[in-house]
């Protein structure tokens, strides 16, 4: 087992899962989409977010810390992320009250490609994801961890992110939950938009 799992694996897994419970930009993006489009219209977001997390984990493994030496590049990523969050949030805050087609099996939803790209962009343009994985893996795993052990931890964390997000959007897409949310959907979307814009504005203010 030690060949694949480092001694601090349980600590890393616990810290990672606890961090998932703390709502961030990805969480509010998922809630905003799942509340209206259900699982069919938001599953691609989960895949995109997981893919973005996977890329950052790979970068950490191969030497993400080197990028920190190029301050201008990291600042550019932060600015891009802030503007992206503001853009997503601006669309959600314009949500208007309207009834959900709860019994309509062919309710129009974003294409799978659009969902994946939106989720991928949300994950990649949030530098905190990179810093989180960098801090988590370097602090908990230590300098003696092997490449195979790092890869095992990386696969585990990506699968946990994907599973958690799918569970979240599945719950939001249940008919019983949808019926309770129907009248307040526009308010949920607007709230999610305000939160996303808040994240973007905070990053923009901190960087500038």
Language model features with spans:
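Short alpha-helical transmembrane interface motifs in multi-pass membrane proteins
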Residues: 10-15, 83-86, 117-121, 152, ...
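Selective transmembrane alpha-helices of multi-pass membrane proteins
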Residues: 70-100, 157, 161-167, 179-208
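Juxtamembrane cytosolic amphipathic helices that cap and anchor the N-termini
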Residues: 7-8, 110-115, 127
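Cytosolic-biased juxtamembrane loops and peripheral soluble domains of multi-pass membrane proteins
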Residues: 93-122, 173, 178-180
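Core segments of transmembrane alpha-helices
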Residues: 122-135, 192-196
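Juxtamembrane transmembrane-helix termini in multi-pass membrane transport proteins
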Residues: 2-75, 135-153, 157
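Hydrophobic/aromatic residues within the transmembrane alpha-helices of Major Facilitator Superfamily
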Residues: 17, 21, 54, 90, ...
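Alpha-helical transmembrane segments and their lipid-water interface positions
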Residues: 26, 52-63, 85-91, 130, ...
């Amino acid at each position: 087992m030690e060949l694949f799992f480092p001694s601090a694996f349980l600590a890393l897994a616990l810290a990672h899962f606890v961090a998932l419970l703390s709502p961030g930009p990805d969480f509010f993006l998922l809630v905003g989409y799942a509340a209206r489009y259900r699982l069919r219209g938001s599953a691609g977001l989960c895949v995109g977010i997981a893919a973005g997390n996977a890329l950052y984990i790979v970068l950490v493994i191969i030497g993400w810390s080197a990028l920190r030496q190029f301050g201008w590049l990291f600042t550019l990523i932060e600015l891009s992320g802030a503007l992206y969050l503001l853009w997503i949030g601006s669309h959600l805050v314009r949500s208007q009250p309207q009834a959900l087609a709860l019994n309509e099996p062919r309710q129009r939803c974003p294409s799978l490609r659009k969902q994946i790209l939106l989720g991928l962009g949300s994950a990649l343009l949030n530098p905190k994801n990179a810093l989180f994985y960098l801090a988590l893996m370097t602090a908990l795993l230590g300098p003696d961890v092997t490449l195979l052990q790092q890869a095992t931890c990386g696969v585990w964390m990506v699968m946990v992110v994907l599973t958690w997000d799918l569970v979240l959007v599945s719950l939001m897409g249940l008919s019983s939950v949808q019926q309770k949310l129907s009248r307040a959907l526009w308010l949920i979307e607007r709230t999610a938009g305000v939160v996303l814009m808040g994240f973007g504005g905070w990053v923009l203010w901190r960087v500038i």
